[in-house]
């Protein structure tokens, strides 16, 4: 078993990674506070893993809430359902929430944990590749608003992240590919050696070879833990983790949450960011070609929706959380293995990149 730690002083917490972790009760019970537990999951994950988790927690008073599946339900209405379930059964601050599912479940349950009685403990049990390598680590919790993604939320750290890589065996191929967008992101912004490893081992990852999967997930979590330990609330280096997300969030909002998966939108956004960096001279054509080839090898889109024009992108991008003093700030690669936040990309530059990105 791999065990990492997010170093945040009194709010530090472990990340445990292994195949078959959800067969061992002590993995979960070591960080449960009190005797009451509420598991929140969705209609897809519940038939696969809910009963197993309930059995592991036989010594606790366990309740569960099963929510609809999908990004379309990452809303204040879903948040309110969790609040009501907790209130109706008189849960207190000694209750532990368990987020059993992908990124949507982790985000909305984390926000509920941050908000209920001003904060109760929660444990992340991510079941998708995207949530295992990214969203379960770092304490970003949120719901969407019709005008923008993740606009209502809080920074609130879990007590524990439990990553059972066997959960990926039940993941649909499209969801697995979407998770690879975040895996590739880490290589682009932080670790050129990891990027090269991904180029050499993508076929092993696609085949879900256990050793390759375990290494990729561990490396992503190492990078995420390092970044979050340096900058928990995204005032500095953590912003680099948003490579492709400003463009990607615009695609998700414009096309309707769930029609493009988050990872698919991030992949297309990553190519737009790479092409913006190319126009500025911060990457070479060869490096952009390598990024494109790796995304394609992971079965990810590399172009924006052809019907989505500059005006549609800008309308959503102006609401991005990284906007400061009215200036749009973009995360752009610097070669492969580094990235930067820039605030001087002109509308003319964006227009050229977006228009070419639709026709690529």
Curated annotation (Swiss-Prot):
Its cofactor is Co(2+); Zn(2+); NAD(+). Keywords: Amino-acid biosynthesis, Aromatic amino acid biosynthesis, Cobalt, Cytoplasm, Lyase, Metal-binding, NAD, Nucleotide-binding, Zinc. One of its GO terms (biological process) is amino acid biosynthetic process. The keyword Zinc-finger does not apply. GO terms for cellular component: cytoplasm. Its main location: cytoplasm. NAD(+) binds at residues 69-74, 103-107, 127-128, 140, 149, 167-170. It is found in: Cytoplasm. It is an enzyme of class 4 (lyase). Pathway: Metabolic intermediate biosynthesis; chorismate biosynthesis; chorismate from D-erythrose 4-phosphate and phosphoenolpyruvate: step 2/7. Its EC number is 4.2.3.4. Pfam families: DHQ_synthase, DHQS_C. It catalyses: 7-phospho-2-dehydro-3-deoxy-D-arabino-heptonate = 3-dehydroquinate + phosphate. Disulfide bonds: none annotated. Zn(2+) binds at residues 182, 245, 262. It comes from the Bacteria. Catalyzes the conversion of 3-deoxy-D-arabino-heptulosonate 7-phosphate (DAHP) to dehydroquinate (DHQ). Belongs to the sugar phosphate cyclases superfamily. Dehydroquinate synthase family. This is 3-dehydroquinate synthase. It comes from Aeromonas hydrophila subsp. hydrophila (strain ATCC 7966 / DSM 30187 / BCRC 13018 / CCUG 14551 / JCM 1027 / KCTC 2358 / NCIMB 9240 / NCTC 8049). The gene is aroB.
